[in-house]
Design a protein with these regions (language model features):
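Hydrophobic residues embedded in beta-strands of well-ordered beta-sheets
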Residues: 66, 103, 141-143, 183, ...
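Acidic, serine/threonine- and glycine-rich low-complexity intrinsically disordered segments
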Residues: 156-247
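Flexible, membrane-facing loop/turn or short amphipathic-helix motifs
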Residues: 74-83, 111-124, 149-161, 191-203, ...
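Extended terminal
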Residues: 2-14, 55-56, 226-232, 236, ...
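Membrane-interface amphipathic/juxtamembrane segments adjacent to transmembrane helices
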Residues: 38-50
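N-terminal type II signal-anchor transmembrane helix
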Residues: 2-39
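N-terminal beta-strand/beta-hairpin edge segment
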Residues: 47-176, 242
Length: 342
Protein backbone atom coordinates (compact mmCIF):
# COMPACT_ATOMS: atom_id res chain seq x y z
CA UNK A 1 0.00 0.00 0.00
CA UNK A 2 2.81 2.39 0.93
CA UNK A 3 4.73 1.43 -2.20
CA UNK A 4 1.70 2.17 -4.36
CA UNK A 5 1.27 5.51 -2.63
CA UNK A 6 4.93 6.36 -3.24
CA UNK A 7 4.57 5.41 -6.91
CA UNK A 8 1.54 7.67 -7.27
CA UNK A 9 3.40 10.55 -5.62
CA UNK A 10 6.46 9.95 -7.80
CA UNK A 11 4.31 9.84 -10.93
CA UNK A 12 2.52 13.03 -9.88
CA UNK A 13 5.89 14.75 -9.49
CA UNK A 14 7.72 13.25 -12.46
CA UNK A 15 4.95 13.48 -15.07
CA UNK A 16 4.78 17.31 -15.05
CA UNK A 17 8.58 17.43 -15.11
CA UNK A 18 8.70 15.07 -18.09
CA UNK A 19 5.99 17.04 -19.90
CA UNK A 20 7.68 20.34 -19.09
CA UNK A 21 11.04 19.00 -20.18
CA UNK A 22 9.55 17.64 -23.40
CA UNK A 23 7.82 20.95 -24.12
CA UNK A 24 11.06 22.82 -23.40
CA UNK A 25 12.98 20.58 -25.79
CA UNK A 26 10.27 21.04 -28.43
CA UNK A 27 10.30 24.83 -27.96
CA UNK A 28 14.10 24.97 -28.26
CA UNK A 29 14.00 22.78 -31.37
CA UNK A 30 11.29 24.91 -32.97
CA UNK A 31 13.14 28.12 -32.06
CA UNK A 32 16.30 26.72 -33.65
CA UNK A 33 14.37 25.77 -36.80
CA UNK A 34 12.81 29.23 -36.97
CA UNK A 35 16.18 30.95 -36.64
CA UNK A 36 17.90 28.62 -39.10
CA UNK A 37 15.01 29.01 -41.55
CA UNK A 38 15.21 32.80 -41.73
CA UNK A 39 17.87 32.87 -44.50
CA UNK A 40 15.79 30.40 -46.54
CA UNK A 41 12.71 32.56 -46.00
CA UNK A 42 14.63 35.63 -47.17
CA UNK A 43 15.82 33.72 -50.25
CA UNK A 44 12.26 32.65 -51.04
CA UNK A 45 11.12 36.28 -50.80
CA UNK A 46 13.68 37.26 -53.42
CA UNK A 47 11.76 35.21 -55.96
CA UNK A 48 8.91 37.68 -55.31
CA UNK A 49 11.29 40.66 -55.91
CA UNK A 50 11.55 41.33 -52.16
CA UNK A 51 14.94 41.77 -50.48
CA UNK A 52 14.82 41.18 -46.72
CA UNK A 53 17.82 41.97 -44.53
CA UNK A 54 18.59 42.67 -40.88
CA UNK A 55 21.59 43.45 -38.72
CA UNK A 56 20.69 41.18 -35.82
CA UNK A 57 17.99 38.74 -34.76
CA UNK A 58 17.16 36.94 -31.52
CA UNK A 59 14.58 34.25 -30.78
CA UNK A 60 12.82 34.72 -27.43
CA UNK A 61 9.39 34.33 -25.83
CA UNK A 62 9.82 31.06 -23.90
CA UNK A 63 7.65 29.42 -22.71
CA UNK A 64 4.32 30.61 -24.17
CA UNK A 65 5.40 32.32 -27.40
CA UNK A 66 7.92 32.47 -30.20
CA UNK A 67 9.25 36.00 -30.58
CA UNK A 68 11.67 37.20 -33.24
CA UNK A 69 13.47 40.40 -32.29
CA UNK A 70 15.09 42.09 -35.31
CA UNK A 71 17.38 45.12 -35.30
CA UNK A 72 17.83 47.37 -38.34
CA UNK A 73 15.50 45.39 -40.57
CA UNK A 74 14.89 46.44 -44.18
CA UNK A 75 12.40 45.24 -46.79
CA UNK A 76 13.12 46.39 -50.34
CA UNK A 77 10.61 45.75 -53.12
CA UNK A 78 12.53 45.41 -56.40
CA UNK A 79 9.46 44.95 -58.56
CA UNK A 80 9.42 48.06 -60.82
CA UNK A 81 5.64 48.25 -60.42
CA UNK A 82 5.83 48.77 -56.65
CA UNK A 83 9.52 49.55 -55.97
CA UNK A 84 9.94 50.84 -52.43
CA UNK A 85 12.20 50.51 -49.39
CA UNK A 86 10.87 50.11 -45.84
CA UNK A 87 13.31 50.49 -42.94
CA UNK A 88 12.76 49.95 -39.21
CA UNK A 89 15.31 50.20 -36.36
CA UNK A 90 13.48 47.48 -34.42
CA UNK A 91 10.84 44.88 -35.22
CA UNK A 92 9.35 42.29 -32.90
CA UNK A 93 7.24 39.49 -34.41
CA UNK A 94 5.58 37.08 -31.99
CA UNK A 95 3.29 34.06 -32.30
CA UNK A 96 1.79 31.48 -29.97
CA UNK A 97 2.85 27.87 -30.52
CA UNK A 98 -0.79 26.88 -30.94
CA UNK A 99 -1.38 29.71 -33.49
CA UNK A 100 1.71 29.50 -35.72
CA UNK A 101 0.02 31.25 -38.68
CA UNK A 102 -0.79 34.46 -36.78
CA UNK A 103 2.13 36.77 -35.96
CA UNK A 104 1.80 40.02 -34.00
CA UNK A 105 4.12 42.85 -35.00
CA UNK A 106 5.53 45.72 -32.97
CA UNK A 107 7.73 48.52 -34.31
CA UNK A 108 8.44 50.58 -31.18
CA UNK A 109 10.99 52.81 -32.92
CA UNK A 110 8.82 53.44 -35.96
CA UNK A 111 9.52 53.00 -39.66
CA UNK A 112 10.42 54.89 -42.82
CA UNK A 113 9.21 54.09 -46.34
CA UNK A 114 10.64 55.60 -49.53
CA UNK A 115 10.46 54.81 -53.24
CA UNK A 116 13.36 52.59 -54.29
CA UNK A 117 16.45 54.56 -55.26
CA UNK A 118 15.56 57.60 -53.18
CA UNK A 119 14.56 59.82 -56.11
CA UNK A 120 14.80 63.50 -55.03
CA UNK A 121 11.38 65.00 -54.38
CA UNK A 122 9.67 61.63 -54.00
CA UNK A 123 7.32 60.91 -51.11
CA UNK A 124 8.81 59.78 -47.80
CA UNK A 125 6.51 58.19 -45.23
CA UNK A 126 7.65 58.05 -41.61
CA UNK A 127 6.02 57.18 -38.30
CA UNK A 128 7.35 57.03 -34.72
CA UNK A 129 5.58 53.74 -33.92
CA UNK A 130 3.41 51.02 -35.44
CA UNK A 131 1.80 47.73 -34.49
CA UNK A 132 0.16 45.05 -36.58
CA UNK A 133 -0.63 41.44 -37.39
CA UNK A 134 0.33 39.09 -40.20
CA UNK A 135 -1.87 36.03 -40.70
CA UNK A 136 -2.42 33.23 -43.19
CA UNK A 137 -6.17 32.79 -43.75
CA UNK A 138 -7.34 30.22 -46.30
CA UNK A 139 -3.82 30.33 -47.80
CA UNK A 140 -4.10 34.10 -48.36
CA UNK A 141 -1.62 36.41 -46.62
CA UNK A 142 -3.22 39.25 -44.66
CA UNK A 143 -1.47 42.21 -43.09
CA UNK A 144 -2.99 44.73 -40.68
CA UNK A 145 -1.06 47.75 -39.42
CA UNK A 146 -1.87 50.59 -37.05
CA UNK A 147 0.53 53.42 -37.89
CA UNK A 148 0.74 56.11 -35.23
CA UNK A 149 1.20 59.77 -36.17
CA UNK A 150 2.45 59.15 -39.72
CA UNK A 151 3.95 61.99 -41.72
CA UNK A 152 4.22 62.11 -45.50
CA UNK A 153 6.79 64.46 -47.02
CA UNK A 154 6.10 64.78 -50.75
CA UNK A 155 8.01 67.80 -51.97
CA UNK A 156 6.18 70.90 -50.80
CA UNK A 157 2.97 68.99 -49.98
CA UNK A 158 3.31 67.53 -46.46
CA UNK A 159 0.56 65.41 -44.94
CA UNK A 160 0.10 64.16 -41.40
CA UNK A 161 -2.46 62.19 -39.40
CA UNK A 162 -3.08 61.03 -35.86
CA UNK A 163 -3.62 57.39 -36.79
CA UNK A 164 -3.79 55.30 -39.96
CA UNK A 165 -5.02 51.72 -40.20
CA UNK A 166 -3.78 49.71 -43.19
CA UNK A 167 -5.08 46.37 -44.45
CA UNK A 168 -3.41 44.34 -47.20
CA UNK A 169 -4.61 41.04 -48.66
CA UNK A 170 -2.35 38.99 -50.94
CA UNK A 171 -4.08 36.00 -52.57
CA UNK A 172 -2.31 32.66 -52.38
CA UNK A 173 -1.96 32.54 -56.16
CA UNK A 174 -1.84 35.27 -58.79
CA UNK A 175 -5.02 35.88 -60.78
CA UNK A 176 -5.45 34.04 -64.06
CA UNK A 177 -8.08 36.42 -65.42
CA UNK A 178 -9.89 39.73 -64.85
CA UNK A 179 -12.45 38.13 -62.52
CA UNK A 180 -9.83 37.14 -59.91
CA UNK A 181 -8.21 39.51 -57.36
CA UNK A 182 -4.55 40.43 -57.50
CA UNK A 183 -4.44 42.58 -54.39
CA UNK A 184 -6.71 44.07 -51.75
CA UNK A 185 -5.85 47.30 -49.93
CA UNK A 186 -7.75 49.38 -47.38
CA UNK A 187 -6.91 52.58 -45.50
CA UNK A 188 -8.66 54.26 -42.59
CA UNK A 189 -7.17 57.68 -41.79
CA UNK A 190 -8.07 59.59 -38.62
CA UNK A 191 -7.51 63.33 -38.09
CA UNK A 192 -5.80 64.01 -41.40
CA UNK A 193 -3.93 67.33 -41.63
CA UNK A 194 -3.88 68.84 -45.14
CA UNK A 195 -1.38 71.50 -46.27
CA UNK A 196 -4.16 73.66 -47.71
CA UNK A 197 -7.86 73.63 -46.88
CA UNK A 198 -10.51 75.41 -48.98
CA UNK A 199 -13.21 77.27 -47.04
CA UNK A 200 -15.58 76.53 -45.39
CA UNK A 201 -13.59 73.48 -44.24
CA UNK A 202 -10.74 73.40 -41.73
CA UNK A 203 -8.18 70.90 -40.44
CA UNK A 204 -8.31 68.12 -39.50
CA UNK A 205 -10.35 65.79 -41.70
CA UNK A 206 -12.04 63.68 -39.04
CA UNK A 207 -11.97 60.41 -40.98
CA UNK A 208 -11.29 59.25 -44.53
CA UNK A 209 -11.37 55.60 -45.53
CA UNK A 210 -10.89 53.68 -48.76
CA UNK A 211 -10.99 49.99 -49.65
CA UNK A 212 -10.07 48.71 -53.11
CA UNK A 213 -9.49 45.37 -54.82
CA UNK A 214 -7.30 45.17 -57.92
CA UNK A 215 -8.88 42.68 -60.30
CA UNK A 216 -6.88 40.87 -62.95
CA UNK A 217 -3.17 40.10 -63.32
CA UNK A 218 -0.74 43.02 -63.02
CA UNK A 219 1.99 42.45 -65.62
CA UNK A 220 5.62 43.43 -65.00
CA UNK A 221 7.23 46.38 -66.71
CA UNK A 222 7.33 50.18 -66.50
CA UNK A 223 4.15 51.79 -65.12
CA UNK A 224 2.74 52.93 -68.48
CA UNK A 225 3.27 49.55 -70.16
CA UNK A 226 1.98 47.62 -67.14
CA UNK A 227 -1.13 49.82 -66.88
CA UNK A 228 -1.87 49.43 -70.60
CA UNK A 229 -1.48 45.64 -70.46
CA UNK A 230 -3.63 45.45 -67.31
CA UNK A 231 -6.34 47.53 -69.01
CA UNK A 232 -6.21 45.49 -72.23
CA UNK A 233 -6.61 42.27 -70.22
CA UNK A 234 -9.84 43.59 -68.68
CA UNK A 235 -8.38 44.72 -65.37
CA UNK A 236 -10.53 46.87 -63.10
CA UNK A 237 -10.30 48.52 -59.71
CA UNK A 238 -13.23 47.54 -57.50
CA UNK A 239 -13.75 50.34 -55.00
CA UNK A 240 -15.38 48.43 -52.17
CA UNK A 241 -15.97 51.53 -50.09
CA UNK A 242 -15.15 55.21 -49.84
CA UNK A 243 -16.14 57.21 -46.78
CA UNK A 244 -15.42 60.74 -45.60
CA UNK A 245 -16.37 62.70 -42.48
CA UNK A 246 -15.25 66.31 -42.55
CA UNK A 247 -17.22 68.90 -40.64
CA UNK A 248 -20.77 68.91 -42.02
CA UNK A 249 -19.68 66.90 -45.07
CA UNK A 250 -20.29 63.16 -45.06
CA UNK A 251 -19.81 60.92 -48.06
CA UNK A 252 -20.11 57.20 -48.75
CA UNK A 253 -19.72 55.43 -52.08
CA UNK A 254 -18.69 52.26 -53.88
CA UNK A 255 -18.16 51.46 -57.52
CA UNK A 256 -15.74 50.40 -60.26
CA UNK A 257 -12.85 52.14 -62.00
CA UNK A 258 -11.06 51.26 -65.22
CA UNK A 259 -8.66 52.96 -67.63
CA UNK A 260 -9.66 54.49 -70.95
CA UNK A 261 -7.68 54.57 -74.20
CA UNK A 262 -5.46 57.35 -72.79
CA UNK A 263 -4.87 55.43 -69.53
CA UNK A 264 -7.04 57.89 -67.61
CA UNK A 265 -9.68 56.72 -65.10
CA UNK A 266 -13.30 56.12 -66.03
CA UNK A 267 -15.87 54.76 -63.64
CA UNK A 268 -19.21 54.90 -61.93
CA UNK A 269 -20.13 54.99 -58.24
CA UNK A 270 -23.28 55.01 -56.17
CA UNK A 271 -23.56 56.44 -52.69
CA UNK A 272 -24.78 59.30 -50.57
CA UNK A 273 -23.66 62.83 -49.76
CA UNK A 274 -24.54 64.99 -46.78
CA UNK A 275 -23.41 68.60 -46.51
CA UNK A 276 -23.28 68.95 -50.29
CA UNK A 277 -23.60 72.73 -49.97
CA UNK A 278 -20.26 72.91 -48.15
CA UNK A 279 -18.75 70.63 -50.79
CA UNK A 280 -19.81 72.97 -53.59
CA UNK A 281 -18.46 75.99 -51.71
CA UNK A 282 -15.12 74.24 -51.29
CA UNK A 283 -14.98 73.31 -54.98
CA UNK A 284 -15.66 76.93 -55.90
CA UNK A 285 -13.09 78.26 -53.40
CA UNK A 286 -10.42 75.92 -54.79
CA UNK A 287 -11.15 77.00 -58.37
CA UNK A 288 -12.52 73.67 -59.62
CA UNK A 289 -15.84 75.26 -60.59
CA UNK A 290 -17.18 78.81 -60.74
CA UNK A 291 -19.21 80.25 -57.88
CA UNK A 292 -22.32 80.59 -60.05
CA UNK A 293 -22.10 76.95 -61.11
CA UNK A 294 -21.60 75.91 -57.48
CA UNK A 295 -24.73 77.82 -56.42
CA UNK A 296 -26.77 76.30 -59.27
CA UNK A 297 -25.50 72.81 -58.41
CA UNK A 298 -26.42 73.27 -54.73
CA UNK A 299 -29.93 74.36 -55.70
CA UNK A 300 -30.34 71.47 -58.13
CA UNK A 301 -29.09 68.90 -55.62
CA UNK A 302 -31.44 70.22 -52.93
CA UNK A 303 -34.40 68.95 -54.97
CA UNK A 304 -33.10 65.39 -54.51
CA UNK A 305 -32.22 65.74 -50.82
CA UNK A 306 -34.09 64.05 -48.02
CA UNK A 307 -33.90 64.85 -44.33
CA UNK A 308 -32.24 62.08 -42.35
CA UNK A 309 -32.78 60.98 -38.74
CA UNK A 310 -30.21 63.55 -37.60
CA UNK A 311 -32.17 66.38 -39.22
CA UNK A 312 -29.56 66.95 -41.93
CA UNK A 313 -30.29 66.80 -45.63
CA UNK A 314 -28.64 64.03 -47.60
CA UNK A 315 -28.85 62.91 -51.20
CA UNK A 316 -28.54 59.42 -52.63
CA UNK A 317 -26.75 59.97 -55.90
CA UNK A 318 -24.24 58.68 -58.39
CA UNK A 319 -20.72 59.84 -59.13
CA UNK A 320 -19.06 59.17 -62.46
CA UNK A 321 -15.83 59.90 -64.31
CA UNK A 322 -15.91 60.08 -68.10
CA UNK A 323 -13.84 61.85 -70.75
CA UNK A 324 -11.71 63.48 -68.07
CA UNK A 325 -14.68 65.07 -66.29
CA UNK A 326 -16.33 64.31 -62.94
CA UNK A 327 -20.10 64.27 -62.49
CA UNK A 328 -22.18 64.26 -59.30
CA UNK A 329 -25.45 62.86 -60.57
CA UNK A 330 -26.15 64.78 -63.80
CA UNK A 331 -24.11 67.81 -62.69
CA UNK A 332 -20.57 68.29 -63.98
CA UNK A 333 -18.39 69.35 -61.06
CA UNK A 334 -15.01 69.69 -62.76
CA UNK A 335 -12.07 67.98 -64.47
CA UNK A 336 -10.51 64.79 -63.17
CA UNK A 337 -6.83 65.19 -62.21
CA UNK A 338 -4.62 63.79 -64.96
CA UNK A 339 -2.49 60.70 -64.22
CA UNK A 340 1.08 60.97 -65.51
CA UNK A 341 2.42 57.42 -65.94
CA UNK A 342 5.94 58.49 -66.96
Amino acid sequence: MRRRKRLIIAAAVLLPLVLFGGYTALWLYAAHRVREGLPQWAAAMRTQHLDLSWQGVRVAGYPLAFRLEFTKIAVCDRDPRFAADVLAPMLTAGARPWHPFVWHLDLPAGLTATPAGGVPGSAVVSAPAATGTVAIVDADARLWLAVHEPHVAAGAVPLAARLVYVWLILPARPPSGPDEPALGVALDVHDLILPQVPPPFHNPVEEASLGVTVMGPIPPGPPRQAAAAWRDAGGTLEVDHVALRWGDLSLTANGTLALDADLQPIGAFSGGVGGYGELMKALAASGWIGKRKADLATTALSFFAKTGPDGRKRIATSFSIQDGEMFLGPIKIGPMPHIDWD
